[in-house]
Structures are given as structure tokens and as C-alpha cells.
Amino acid sequence: MSHTHHTVKHTHVRPAMTPAQSGIHVAIIMDGNGRWANARGRPRTAGHIAGARVVRKIVEAAPDCGIGMLTLYAFSADNWARPSREVALLMRLFRRYLVAETDRCVTNNVRMRIIGRRDRIPSELLRSIKVAEEATRHGTRLDLRIAVDYSSRDALVRAAERLNAQQSVTRDDLSHAMCKVDHWDGECRDVDLLIRTGGEQRLSDFLLWECAYAELYFTDRRWPDFTSADLGAAVKEFHSRERRFGTVPEAAAG
């Protein structure tokens, strides 16, 4: 009586990438709120209120545009120098956004994370941040990162301080250290497309390390007027560009 032995091969199947992992990383400098309000004879605070409403629309539109990670520049470290009344309003608006949008993010499978310093943020806002991050931590459709009290130069300095004791430092070491100081525990990803609204053409100390090879897209449209169609147009132009990452075009190389 013969026995046939079958060898079972075990193959390792890599888990499929989530939409958040496979989509492009878009960063937006949301500029022009104050000028939008001034053009209408209204206080600057009215522009910030109008701009906050746009954030929801852009976040909802992002996954359908093929965006997996969206980083929004909400409040820079330099913005503390603005009038105290304006700063206080921005902090209230941000907390109101977190309270109002956390459940929506859970429903829409969006993970929300706040990057930047946390030692100068009001305690009530800090509590809301922790609640929002914990509630949305399982989101896989979109990684939404909101930069508050953020400075890229400051992040670089603090990351270097963390690595000071190491004998040698690689690019990956620095990237991971910057993620740590910015309270981001996800994948350290470069920016694919940087959008700036409001007509200015500068980076304003935003994601300087991550934007090393980013495509830049500037629009005169002020943030309160920015629409999901504008976002789609920016992404469409991004996909039409040839990204070389320091190399030469294929035609020239051949």
C-alpha cells in the first residue's frame, strides 16, 4: 500500500494597501482668509469662519480625487504673533471643528491626526485633539493631518536633538524622528503635491523636509472660495506633470 505525501507550500500574502496608503499625499497652505474678508468689507475673523466651512468640503472630496493623505496648514508657529483676539478665535474654531467633525470622520473612515507642537495649545483644545485622534484612529480611507502650532524648521531642530546621541544618522532616521516630534505615528511620507491658495508663492516653513520633490501648485483663488472642483483640477495637473526626482527624461536618456 503506497502513501502519497503532498507538500503544502505556505506563501506569504501581503495585505492589500488601504486607500489611505495607496493615494497621493497632498498638502495645502490654506491662505487668503483675511483678504477674502477685507474684499467684502468684513472683519478678518469672518474670513476664518468661512474658511473653516471649506475644510469639510475638501476633506470629503479628497478620497474621490485619489488622495490618501491630506495635510492642512491651519496655524503656524508664527501665527501666535497675530492679534490675541484673532488667535483666540482660531483656537475656538479649531476646537469647534474637531467636536463637529469627529463623528463624521469615523463614519467616512477618515483618520484624523494633529501635527505640530502641543505644549502651547490651550488645554480644552488639547483634550478635544486627543478625543478626535482616539476616535478616528482606525480610519483607512484617508489620513487627515492638520498642522497646528507648526514650524518645519522647529521640527527639524527638535528631530536633530532626538538623534544627537547616535553615531550616524540616515535620512530614514531623520524622517522618523520628525514624525515623532510632530506627534505623527503613521507612515512617514513625502508630499506629492503642495497647493497654496491666495496668490502667494512661498512655502512659509511648511513641510520643508517632506516637500523635497513635491510638485507645487499655486492659485489666486482665496481659501474661502476654493472648491472640490479646484482640488480636482490641481490633482489633474499634478498627474499631467513628469516627475523626474533628479533624473533626466526617458527620451533624453535614450
At which residue positions do the language-model features occur?
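Flexible, compositionally biased loop and terminal segments
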Residues: M1-G254
